[in-house]
Amino acid sequence: MSLTSIPSLREQQHPLIRQLADCIEEVWHQHLDLSPYHLPAELGYVEGRLEGEKLTIENRCYQTPQFRKMHLELAKVGNMLDILHCVMFPRPEYDLPMFGCDLVGGRGQISAAIADLSPVHLDRTLPESYNSALTSLNTLNFSQPRELPEWGNIFSDFCIFVRPSSPEEEAMFLGRVREFLQVHCQGAIAASPVSAEQKQQILAGQHNYCSKQQQNDKTRRVLEKAFGVDWAENYMTTVLFDLPE
C-alpha cells in the first residue's frame, strides 16, 4: 500500500497541510527504519465538539533506533481551523536536536507556520554537524515573520516562524521543512550513542523542551473546551509532549 492511498484527515485540510504531512512521511520512510509507536487506542483518532463545530484529531506515531517517538498530528475544527503538529523525539542516548513543526490555518489561509531543529543543550547550541549543514542553507525572506511566544527561548537561531502570504511563500516553507528533515535524518543515521553523563544532560534538555511546550496556552485552551481539563492535561503530557523516562 502506498502512503498516499491511506485515508487521512489531510485530504480535507488546507493544501499546504496535506503537502507537508505527505512530505514528512515521505522523508521519514526514505531515510529511516520505521516501526509503529503505539499510542493508547482511544487517542489515535479522536472526535469532539468545539463551539458547535466538530473537532477531529488524527495521530500517527512511529519509532526508530534513533527516535523514541515521531509524532504527526492532524486536527480539524469544522471549516474554521486546520492544524498540523509534528515532533521527533530523539532517544536520549543520541545527541540530536528536537525537530518540531506546526501549521495553523483557517478559512483558506495559513496564519502560522513554524519549523525548527531545537537544541537540547542547555546552552542552546546545536551539534556542530547541524550548525554547518543549516548555515549552508539559503537565507529565506518571508514578508510576514512572526514573533516567538514568551516561552520560545527553546528554539534555535534557524527557527522559521512566519505567516506565509502567497503560494510562493508556502512553497518556500515546505522546501525548508524538507531540508530540515533531510539534515536531521542524515544526522541521526550518523550519530553514535553518548556517554552516561551526556545522556543525563540530554535528558535535562529534553525535559526543558517538553515542559516549555506544555505551557502553550492556546493548544491547552482548545483541548479543554472540547474535551475537559483532565483530558486536555492527559493529552498534553502523554501524547503531545510526554517526558522521556
Swiss-Prot record:
It holds the Pfam family Fe_bilin_red. GO terms for biological process: phytochromobilin biosynthetic process. Transmembrane segments: none annotated. Keywords: Oxidoreductase. One of its GO terms (molecular function) is phycocyanobilin:ferredoxin oxidoreductase activity. Its EC number is 1.3.7.5. It catalyses: (2R,3Z)-phycocyanobilin + 4 oxidized [2Fe-2S]-[ferredoxin] = biliverdin IXalpha + 4 reduced [2Fe-2S]-[ferredoxin] + 4 H(+). It is an enzyme of class 1 (oxidoreductase). Catalyzes the four-electron reduction of biliverdin IX-alpha (2-electron reduction at both the A and D rings); the reaction proceeds via an isolatable 2-electron intermediate, 181,182-dihydrobiliverdin. Upon overexpression in E.coli with PCB:ferredoxin oxidoreductase, CpeS and either CpcB or PecB permits synthesis of phycocyanin-coupled CpcB or PecB. PANTHER family: PHYTOCHROMOBILIN:FERREDOXIN OXIDOREDUCTASE, CHLOROPLASTIC. Belongs to the HY2 family. This is Phycocyanobilin:ferredoxin oxidoreductase. It comes from Nostoc sp. (strain PCC 7120 / SAG 25.82 / UTEX 2576). The gene is pcyA.
